[in-house]
């Protein structure tokens, strides 16, 4: 959908419903809202839509609409492991509501798993509780719906001690990321190569040592091309790099959206190495973490398949004074339960879990403060000061 068409729909939705839709919302959100505006008052609707809106910030407008402007009767979420559509890994929910304002003390039936007629779990959630809930997928509680949030936004959170940022998006890993040995054979200059971690599925360890050059001591050492020189200077001073870059044209790589926005086009996003990373997606049930936390002692950065955790002021100062505590920090990250990680993240069809930087930042960091009270001394005041 073009930007112009999305703006037209946003304006139309606001005119007809008063709802301000986030630009990241999927087309189904506009469709549901506009179709409901067309409905007769008192009419009943049943929708089968992706359940992602129940978890994400850009779903807040639809959740608010369902809680405040119509009477939500039932929400049935299918078990993400039970894929409903063979050609789409999407988690699904059936919504049933009446186009009338909700009565006082209204409760909504939430069901999970199985079928509409024979769900695996059922609960009745007061509307007021829904209005205060960031994530609706925590309802109803069930062994397979193991999505529990611990942080209520008032206690210490990982975001108080780490700046969480996605790794770099190169635009074409197959071109920009090379084996270290291959880069050497091509004669590419070391000064314009940076160590980078392999894809999480190829990283078999959660503790990475370093060699003398800052490369991780793992089976396959990789590097990413990252050069800030304009093309004439590369051509004049680094002929091997220039020859390699010329192959991008015949491969059609320079036509990519992300690459086309960069100047020069072979300059990567800038990230410093960090001692801690978290994989961005994964699977896991019960207490098993769907994501892995990595202790990185090399100078390697990560691609956008990783979240990079940069220690903030108090934690960074403690680690500077006591470098030996980095291992304990990694151990505490490894103790975050799979339930909480899934609760703060989002789940897709087939049971694939993902977590964004803001979601990881909301994970409770109470164990950090219990072990090192000094790092939590002014967390609340800093949060109020900087939001």
Model-derived regions: residue spans:
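Polybasic, glycine- and aromatic-enriched phosphate-binding surface used to engage nucleic acids
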Residues: 146-386
């Amino acid at each position: 959908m073009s930007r112009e068409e999305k703006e037209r729909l946003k304006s139309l939705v606001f005119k007809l419903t008063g709802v301000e839709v986030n630009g990241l919302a999927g087309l189904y959100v506009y469709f549901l809202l506009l179709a409901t505006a067309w409905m007769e008052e008192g009419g009943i609707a049943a929708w089968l839509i992706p359940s992602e809106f129940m978890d994400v910030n850009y779903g807040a407008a639809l959740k608010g609409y369902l809680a405040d402007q119509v009477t939500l009767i039932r929400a049935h979420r299918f078990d993400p492991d039970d894929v409903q559509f063979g050609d789409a890994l999407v988690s699904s929910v059936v919504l049933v509501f009446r186009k009338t304002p909700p009565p006082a003390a209204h409760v909504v039936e939430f069901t999970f798993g199985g079928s509409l007629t024979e769900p695996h779990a059922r609960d009745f959630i007061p509307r007021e509780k829904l209005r205060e809930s960031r994530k609706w997928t925590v309802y109803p509680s069930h062994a397979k719906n193991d999505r529990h949030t611990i942080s209520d936004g008032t206690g210490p959170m990982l975001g108080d001690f780490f700046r969480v940022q996605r790794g770099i998006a190169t635009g074409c890993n197959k071109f920009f990321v090379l084996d270290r040995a291959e880069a050497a054979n091509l004669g590419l200059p070391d000064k314009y190569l940076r160590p980078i971690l392999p894809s999480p599925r190829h990283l078999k360890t959660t503790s990475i040592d370093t060699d003398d050059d800052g490369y991780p001591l793992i089976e396959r050492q990789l590097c990413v091309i990252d050069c800030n020189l304009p093309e004439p200077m590369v051509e004049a001073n680094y002929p091997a790099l220039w020859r390699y870059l010329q192959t991008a044209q015949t491969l059609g790589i320079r036509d990519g959206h992300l690459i086309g926005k960069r100047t020069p086009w072979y300059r990567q996003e800038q990230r410093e190495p960090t001692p801690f990373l978290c994989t961005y997606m994964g699977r896991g049930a019960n207490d098993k973490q769907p994501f892995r936390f990595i202790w990185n002692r090399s100078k390697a950065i990560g691609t956008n398949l990783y979240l990079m955790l940069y220690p903030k002021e108090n934690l960074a100062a403690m680690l500077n004074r006591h470098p030996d505590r980095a291992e304990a920090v990694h151990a505490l990250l490894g103790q975050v339960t799979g339930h909480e990680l899934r609760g703060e993240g989002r789940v897709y069809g087939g049971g694939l879990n993902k977590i964004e930087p803001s979601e990881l930042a909301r994970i409770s960091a109470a164990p950090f403060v219990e072990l090192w009270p000094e790092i939590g001394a002014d967390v609340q005041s800093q949060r109020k000061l900087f939001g």
